């Protein structure tokens, strides 16, 4: 119950400004990371820090991904939450991060949610892309697509766009899906992988046995 109450008050915690109506993001992002990112968007919007927060988080994400020791430190379950929160606050202030960014890091540390930082950052990026009229699309395939396949897929995906929206595609290779592809575009998710079909058929056979 306490964690739910903290999330309900997240926007006010992130923002030092007086309580105002929540600023709704242009796209809904699900999960715990989505709730943190949505609250961050609302707080940063009120403080006119949307772009600065995205810049801060992008730089921080790149640093953590490239620095193994820092990554282990940030996600360590051993370090005291208050010590971690204080250290992050001091470091982010030295780096001149926006107040909304500083408060987010402190809150994640206080709540023991720093392991979620990478996914929170990705969720915030998704919201900001929608804010700019970009539709983020991730395509997962078993092997890299050639130029012709990529062009055909891009043409098909553009049919989902509306008005002045632009498409931003990221590709990822995951051999475990065997074949086919998995596409997430905006808030839509389509799994056309062979691995999922095999699992479906296996489940049907086991149920019928």
Curated annotation (Swiss-Prot):
GO terms for cellular component: mitochondrial inner membrane; mitochondrion; proton-transporting ATP synthase complex. It comes from the Eukaryota. Pfam families: OSCP (PF00213). Keywords: ATP synthesis, Hydrogen ion transport, Ion transport, Membrane, Mitochondrion, Mitochondrion inner membrane, Transit peptide, Transport. F-type ATPases have 2 components, CF(1) - the catalytic core - and CF(0) - the membrane proton channel. CF(1) has five subunits: alpha(3), beta(3), gamma(1), delta(1), epsilon(1). CF(0) has three main subunits: a, b and c. Mitochondrial membrane ATP synthase (F(1)F(0) ATP synthase or Complex V) produces ATP from ADP in the presence of a proton gradient across the membrane which is generated by electron transport complexes of the respiratory chain. F-type ATPases consist of two structural domains, F(1) - containing the extramembraneous catalytic core and F(0) - containing the membrane proton channel, linked together by a central stalk and a peripheral stalk. During catalysis, ATP synthesis in the catalytic domain of F(1) is coupled via a rotary mechanism of the central stalk subunits to proton translocation. This is ATP synthase subunit O, mitochondrial. It comes from Drosophila melanogaster.
């Amino acid at each position: 119950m306490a964690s739910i109450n903290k999330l309900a008050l997240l926007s006010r915690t992130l923002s030092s400004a007086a309580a105002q109506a929540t600023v709704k993001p242009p796209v809904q992002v699900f999960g715990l990371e989505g709730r943190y990112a949505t609250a961050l968007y609302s707080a940063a919007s009120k403080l006119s820090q949307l772009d600065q927060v995205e810049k801060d988080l992008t730089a921080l994400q790149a640093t953590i991904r490239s620095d193994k020791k820092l990554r282990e430190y940030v996600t360590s379950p051993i370090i005291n939450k208050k010590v971690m929160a204080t250290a992050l606050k001091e470091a982010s202030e030295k780096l001149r991060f926006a107040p909304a960014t500083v408060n987010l890091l402190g809150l994640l540390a206080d709540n023991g949610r720093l392991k979620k930082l990478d996914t929170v950052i990705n969720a915030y990026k998704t919201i900001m892309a929608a804010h700019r009229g970009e539709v983020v699309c991730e395509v997962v395939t078993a092997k890299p697509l050639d130029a012709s396949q990529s062009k055909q897929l891009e043409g098909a995906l553009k049919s989902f766009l509306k008005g002045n929206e632009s498409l931003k595609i990221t590709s990822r290779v995951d051999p475990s899906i065997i074949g086919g592809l998995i596409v997430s575009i905006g808030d839509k998710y389509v799994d056309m992988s062979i691995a999922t079909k095999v699992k479906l058929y296996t489940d049907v056979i086991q149920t019928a046995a």
